[in-house]
């Protein structure tokens, strides 16, 4: 009976610790992959995109586009 209690007493916290460490590294890997596949867009990128189309946006229009992108997610 003592052996079972000792095994559970050590096994459960050890399993939780290993799970937390594995979860941390897996989440970091997934986050980096998502950032690589879908990088965040900046105001300068929006300005450059519209400049290529021949339009010059005002600062208000750029802020409005950024707001709409954030609300879309």
UniProtKB/Swiss-Prot annotation:
GO cellular component, one term: membrane
One Pfam family from the record: UPF0154
Main location: membrane
Source organism superkingdom: Bacteria
Localisation per UniProt entry: Membrane
Topology with respect to the bilayer: Single-pass membrane protein
UniProt-listed InterPro entries: UPF0154 (IPR005359)
Keyword entries, A-Z: Membrane, Transmembrane, Transmembrane helix
Keyword Membrane assigned: yes
Membrane-spanning ranges: 6-26
Family, per entry: Belongs to the UPF0154 family.
Full protein name: UPF0154 protein MG335.1
Organism: Mycoplasma genitalium (strain ATCC 33530 / DSM 19775 / NCTC 10195 / G37)
